[in-house]
């Protein structure tokens, strides 16, 4: 019996050993898997790839804790940034004239200009040395020295190496800030298996961009944006960002100490000016007349003029101011886009406007430029208003600008900046429906109300003048076409 048992034991022993070894291997594999599962990876992310830097003269741009698609250029150890980036992300008041290679910046009182590749810039009539080239023209834009941008903008920036990156702050909001409790890592994504972007140490300061259950999205002071374990951070605190080195500009306006009751007076010939006494006598309460006297007449910036000094004298004798209207649509052969996108012709136009204001002793200038598109000359039109405003204010002349009600197609108007410079913004509260549109009201109450409320979001109430129509349209609908009859207000009753 024992001999038989011994024989069986000998046969079973190898099997038991093999089974034991298999179990041991499985246990080891399980332990290894558990260790691998819960052991953070030490793999690091290539920061050059992370910041998408492709050459040694590039630097990443991190703006308000967001990585920009734009890159800075390092030229002779100086930082340059693309004009489009400056305009869209830092300060929209910079204006690049690609036709004449000049960079302009308009303050409340001065026009500051710098020519491409020049070390100097002029402030009105004074020339200043910047020390190195301020702006360099490129094939489709321009590169501007970031130090020069900072000189006129509410921004701060710091540069870092390995890899080269610039961290810019341009929004001065409240942020969630915290400090690191213990040394840890910032990773590409939330999870210990995600590659490491940066090692952080105890007491390092970070900004919390988004809080999670276990991982928070954060930004380090040197511009690395990633994820960190929530428990590795102190309790977050609200912190209001400030820029003590920047002093906000003060804009002054020539505003009247009374409500404005303005009438646009359509004048189509020199002889029509003699009718102003009848026009005024048939109205009540008007304190500003704006005759349609001037329009852009050629591509050099010159004006056509049907104004009258007698008209102005009569209005003044009645206690009425005269704000001459200047338009861009009377002469269809003129390319207004060309005039406004070239600094030299834009300057000629402004000088012509001021010359007319002096010659006819105008109290104000009313700009009625229409059919403006962003692609053609949107930015150039805003720059035109800025530059004209400085000339007007230096000579005690009011500037008003006629604008359509806010809509998706005219967001580029930047009414808030326009209101910084112009004294009054005149809402064209009419032509809700027009020739070529569906039939409808010229100026319905809901449409006008929405236009005023939208404008108030950008323009102070005491700078708004609401232009209302004293005309209507009687629409005729036929199977093949839509037409209308244009009627003045006093003619409407007989057609109802």
Language model regions located:
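Primary recognition of N-terminal secretory signal peptides and signal-anchoring hydrophobic helices
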Residues: 3-212, 242-255
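Conserved, compact domain cores that house catalytic/ligand-binding motifs in diverse enzymes
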Residues: 198-205, 210, 262-311
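SH3/SH3-like beta-barrel superfamily modules
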Residues: 201-231
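Boundary/entry segment of secreted carbohydrate-active catalytic domains
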Residues: 230-232, 236-277
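Chitinase-like catalytic core of GlcNAc-active glycosidases
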Residues: 257-267, 295-444
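Short beta-alpha junctions and helix-cap segments that line functional grooves
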Residues: 275-276, 411-415, 452
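Active-site region of glycoside hydrolase catalytic domains
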Residues: 426, 450-476
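Conserved small/polar residues in nucleotide/adenosyl-binding loops
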Residues: 485-492
